[in-house]
Amino acid sequence: MLYLTQRLETPAAATASVTLPIDVRVKSRVKVTLNDGREAGLLLPRGLLLRGGDVLSNEEGTEFVQVIAADEGVSVVRCDDPFMLAKACYHLGNRHVPLQIMPGELRYHHDHVLDDMLRQFGLTVTFGQLPFEPEAGAYASESHGHHHAHHAHHAHSH
C-alpha cells in the first residue's frame, strides 16, 4: 500500500489524484482509494486540513497525489448585501456550523433547519453538489501557512 506522509509546500507534478469530502480531508490517519483505484494510507501530521489542490507525497518522494475536493451536498447562500451575509455568518457561527465564506456567497453542509432560518431573514438558499472548503477554524489548522491564535480555554453559553 502507498503511504502518503507529507503535504508539499511547493507542489510537484501529480502522478495520481484522490477525491475526498471534507470529513476525510480533516483526518490525519485514514485509508483512501485513489482515483486510479489504488489504495493509499494517509499518515499526516495531526491537525492538518487538506484543501483541493494540495499535493501529498510518500516518504521516498516518488509519488505525488493531488487532492481534489469532492462535490458534496451543500446549502448555498448568495447575496450582494454584505450586512445580510454578515448576519448569516453570525447566526451560523453561533451554532458552530462549518462555513465556507466567499465574496457574496456562503456554503455549509445542507441542513433544512438552517436553510429555513436564513430564509426567514429574507435570504435565498439553494442546494448544490459542490466542493466544500470551510474555514479552517471549524476543523483544524490551515494547510497553507495561515496561523491563528488558539486559546487554552473557550467557553460561552448559548
From Swiss-Prot:
Main location per the UniProt record: cytoplasm
Protein localization: Cytoplasm
GO MF term set: nickel cation binding; unfolded protein binding
HAMAP family assigned to the protein according to its UniProt record, in alphabetical order: UreE
NCBIfam families: PRK13261.1-1 (NF009751)
Role noted for this protein: Involved in urease metallocenter assembly. Binds nickel. Probably functions as a nickel donor during metallocenter assembly.
Name of the protein in its database record: Urease accessory protein UreE
Record organism: Klebsiella pneumoniae (strain 342)
